[in-house]
């Protein structure tokens, strides 16, 4: 019996050592330690032995069983560690390799233009102000000398909420708020999103605008013309031809629209509106128009982006087509 046990142990050791997977290891366990396993069969035969030998043989069988189980456990741990190491080796990353840059994003062209405009006006001594996009009728219209019967105040042109709340149609309300807060003299620009009921090749219901304001005791229309010429020359990085046409805005008097000459098409394209601040706007803020004067201007940032990047349809900027936006990396 002892010889059989020793032979069985050696056979089990060899089988366990040769096992290369958990599945094979489980088959070995069943073959030796299962209900019908080799060691179980030997244990059954102990009852046929002389009574004085049974305790010793039973003890020997249990020791062999315990040793085989230990072999199985050790081999199982070894196989799991080997499997884990192989998996880690497959997933290993060489941190010295160059990264992939194929899908890096880029600053949106409207954001590029906005940053450029802010930078240029900061260099010209303007402070940059912001204000709420949801406004009331006083700041958006009344304080700017826009009467109640003006077409811009109709539902056809303006997005209204309940009461007197609306989506601002320009960034001029920021100028009113800043003059209330700071007083005069003042020199600022206000950039941001504005909203109007309009949609075609050169207009969208939401667009971006920068409006500038200068109020002091010596401002003239000549100062306004010189400032706009200098700004546009710097923005387009070349000398541009401008044309000032008489126009009408409720908040400026006199008023003008400014066109820029396009040599490629031999045409003039409107880029902004401007004028001297209307005395009524100053009076609304308790500023004496006999002592102070100033000028204001409004420029569509989207229109500037169209000109700078030679884009013919304004709506392309807002359609999130990566084929289009990828050109501006």
Curated annotation (Swiss-Prot):
Source organism of the structure: Coxiella burnetii (strain CbuK_Q154) (Coxiella burnetii (strain Q154))
Database matches in Pfam families: Phe_tRNA-synt_N (PF02912), tRNA-synt_2d (PF01409)
EC primary class: ligase
Name of the protein in question: Phenylalanine--tRNA ligase alpha subunit
Domain of life of the organism encoding this protein: Bacteria
GO BP, sorted A to Z: phenylalanyl-tRNA aminoacylation
Family to which this protein belongs: Belongs to the class-II aminoacyl-tRNA synthetase family. Phe-tRNA synthetase alpha subunit type 1 subfamily.
Gene Ontology cellular component list: cytoplasm
HAMAP family given in the database record: Phe_tRNA_synth_alpha1
Alphabetic keyword roster: Aminoacyl-tRNA synthetase, ATP-binding, Cytoplasm, Ligase, Magnesium, Metal-binding, Nucleotide-binding, Protein biosynthesis
Organism classification: Bacteria, Pseudomonadati, Pseudomonadota, Gammaproteobacteria, Legionellales
Coiled-coil segments: none
